[in-house]
Amino acid sequence: MEAYFDNSATTKVLDSVKDIVVKTMTEDYGNPAAKHRKGMEAEQYIRDARKIIADTMKVQEKEILFTSGGSESNNMALFGAAWANQRAGKHIISTSIEHPSVYNPLGVLEELGFEVTILPVDHDGHISLKELEEAIRPDTILVSTMYVNNEVGAVEPVEEISKIIKAKNPSTLYHVDAIQAYGKYVIRPKKQGIDLLSVSSHKIHGPKGVGFLYIRNGVKIKPLIYGGGQQAGMRSGTENVPGVAGFGAAAKEMYTNHAEKVQKLIELKDYMT
């Protein structure tokens, strides 16, 4: 019997996910942009998944943008917010323990003339809230932090971070990389003051190659991909119906009886330690 302990890297898909992925690949295979029956059937899977995911966070369905995964979501949050808001300023704040899909785009933005402040973390992986407050300026347009670190497991106090940001500069956007948090924590972007939030499907027993970016209604952000105008013009390209459908199935499973699942994980952790 194989015991797999690398679920922070990726997860095995659930049977319910596998079933809906196969069904959308072999039976309901239409292009969701098509106006005939097969297309409308495919589009319904996307609508259903978007509703499921929006409901898990108590946000509007139109605030969920499907992507090819966490890296694209992070890239769009950073580049899209920077390009759309650069008239207000060109200063961005992040931390020293971000994923390469955040850290590397910040390097590119620096090459393009943006100023990036990288905050250090303590030995537990947490940023100093005092240093964050001191770093925020009138021209700070974006702060980007992880929710849960993928290597050391540090959990950042995102709601406290947001309060500091909005108190110092209400127009500064707050992006959260929640790729290791979604499915494990109850996430409420509205309550927690999060403007942009990245998630990946394969971290929650869904398919690889699909994710989403939560974009709070009213946030100014530009697309990364231009073309046929899918997803209200924010992310062109024919949608990955099997991936999105599988993502929705995984999200539904993760947040059904969520408290009981979390308690079981805590018991297993305590047993192993």
Regions found by a protein language model. Give the residues of each.
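Pyridoxal 5′-phosphate
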Residues: 1-273
